[in-house]
Amino acid sequence: MTIEFNPSKRATLGVEWELQLVDRDSGHLRQDAQKLLEELPELSGAESNPPLRHELMQSTIEVVTGICETVDEVKEDLSATVARLTQAADGRGIELACAGTHPIDDWRDQEFAPSQRYSELIEQMQWLARRILTFGVHVHVGVTDRDKVIPIVNALSRYLPHFLALTASSPFWSGHDTGLASSRSIVFGALPTAGPPPRLAHWGAFEEYMDTLLRAGTITSIKEVWWDIRPHPEFGTVEIRMFDGIPTVREVGMAAALSQSLVQLFEQQLDRGYRLPSPSSWVVTDNKWRATRYGLDARIIIDERGSTVPLRDDLYELLHELRPIAERLGCAEDLDVVAEILHYGASYERQRAIIRQGGVLKDVVDALVKEFRAGAPAVGSSHGRTDPSRNGGPSHAGA
């Protein structure tokens, strides 16, 4: 089969941000997505790409940007839509928040959005779909030529653990500490067409693989392929779907800057005739697990021999490499948030710090709500990175 790719302008951006609807008093999720969307028809109407959309659960609303040239445009677009949504939510006693999972609520208590697509998904996947009470962020980055797409997807898979660890925000599942930095990656990754992208050779191999899945009845549309990093032919982008739910617009800007800078780097290298790195599938899968379990304290595999380095060190090196590109793109300050997170802690660390200092899970929910309203992480004595020896530690991560 032939799959048309609509080329983008170089490194344009689009972001999808899945938000939790939280009751202001109880901290539990509210099943009011349909009511809020009906209250804001100008933002959720019949146009093909409205900025507010349903997700699987009635406790979730997705905020979507238009096509943006810069990270600043992404943040402005998201903030404007969130401001309108916040107004409507305030009138119903609802707060907005974002994390990969809700720390307390159980998937069994959720209502599903009224959608034929979601009904078919639940019928097909059953328990796997019913328990997807998860929240993520997807970043689209434009690619100029279809023949560049698969090499860029393969190269980006080297940084899959970096994307996940920086945004890991789901240590709790149904009121319990899972011991993971990201339980969301396990829950969503259980779907048969989710997980790390397969290592393909070129666009023709991607077309052949999609044709095989369609012929086999595994999927009915290529939109049902939910890889952690995937081509999006209609939008002319590479879509990075590995990010856990991101609590603040400042950190969303970081994710967009990191994504845009990497894709721009790989485009430039391809233009100069370089061959991009393409790690083996076993390395990508193993590294994803390490980031899922240990977050920023993981040791990641860097070659086929199994050599490992601390993920934190690799991130600092990556920042140094990407800095000139980020400056040209105008997103250097957003990229610098990576260093801030390495200093004060990713969301999973900030959440656990609250419990470690005597708080309860309702306090974690309240902190997520406050961070979302502030637009930036709460940094202070009650937050910060955990001691690696207390959450698995690099020595175990590299075993």
Curated annotation (Swiss-Prot):
It catalyses: L-cysteine + L-glutamate + ATP = gamma-L-glutamyl-L-cysteine + ADP + phosphate + H(+). Residues 377-399 are annotated as: Disordered. Keywords: ATP-binding, Ligase, Nucleotide-binding. The keyword Protease does not apply. GO terms for biological process: modified amino acid biosynthetic process. GO terms for molecular function: ATP binding; glutamate-cysteine ligase activity. It is an enzyme of class 6 (ligase). Its EC number is 6.3.2.2. Belongs to the glutamate--cysteine ligase type 2 family. YbdK subfamily. NCBIfam families: gshA_cyan_rel, PRK13517.1-2, PRK13517.1-3. HAMAP family: Glu_cys_ligase_2 (MF_01609). ATP-dependent carboxylate-amine ligase which exhibits weak glutamate--cysteine ligase activity. This is Putative glutamate--cysteine ligase 2. The lineage of its organism: Bacteria, Bacillati, Actinomycetota, Actinomycetes, Streptosporangiales.
